[in-house]
Amino acid sequence: MEYPKFKVTVSCMTYNQSKYITDAMNGFTMQQTSFPFVCTIVDDASTDGEQEVIRKYVEDNFDFSEGSVAYHKETDYAHITYAQHKANKNCYFAVLYLKENHYSQRKPKMGYLSEWRDMCEYEAPCEGDDYWIDPDKLQKQKRYLDDHKDCSICHTNVKWYIQNTGKYIIKQEWKEFNKSLESRQDIIIENILDSNKYYIQTNTVLYRTKVYNSLSDELLGFRKLFLLGDTTLWCLLIRHGKIHYDETITSVYRINTGSVSHQNNIEKKLRFYLSGAEMRLYMYNYLGLNNIQLFDKFNAEYKQIFFLYRAYNRNYVRFIDMKWNNKIFEHLYNIMDNFITSCVIKRFLSFYFLIKNIHK
């Protein structure tokens, strides 16, 4: 099929977000652009009725009349629908309703989108529970990257929506810090790795697809090592070009808070923290950074979190060497297999997270 000359692909990966996906799709279709763009929505075999929500939205808002460009097709992995929006003629949807959950099988999904992605100069990610509120987001960001060929990624300010309280939060300190580093491109990567001091929210981003594709092998390797992949992507994109920050709030990041007082949740939380600590140390060495104070900080954080996680999973094998300057901490690590020590740490963490959750 002959497609329009799409300039931007919107990448939306979603699973069991039936309550929120309409907000995301409304954010896509509201975009006012001077160019055609395609929104690739991949539902990973949701079990909460999300696929039905998406189908209903597409049927109601997209053109399936005789002579339209719309089509349905089935492959061995998905049912696919492609159509043009009824009112916003520059907006197209390509929706993939996956037949099997790929995340649980660790099967990649990006390859399914090459039919549309490969023709696009830029890509804008937005997961199914987040959404855009600025109708000019794509237009402004594309224009900036068109005019600044040395820039590989741009992003904007964001506000958080706390789902269980209904409150919005705007982090003023992030805005000020991000703007202060606009002329210090040389230290932005360090400040991304250092607890996200330089903050990039995924659904505010637009980056060059060609640069992303050139990093695919590296990114695939990182995804096999770490539980979070966006930070490594930002670092690699910035290594290949400049980054631009726009203080305009274009997007909303939704936070769904749940109970962390149960042991299984605490273990998963610690595992996520540990993966982040591993990633920071690994990327410090991988990118050849030269800041000994930052290295010492990352190393200390890694040891502390690893020490705590061992209370829950004594079989976990580290893949990053530890450097010990303090014999006491080295000794404590060596006795972590002691059952009593593990129980004490578990009880302490259960109490800590319970109190922290109560006072939120």
Regions found by a protein language model. Give the residues of each.
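Active-site nucleotide-sugar/metal-binding loop of Leloir-type enzymes
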Residues: 110-122
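Conserved nucleotide-sugar donor-binding catalytic segment
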Residues: 156, 174-266
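Catalytic core of nucleotide-sugar-dependent glycosyltransferases
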Residues: 186, 226, 249-257, 263-292, ...
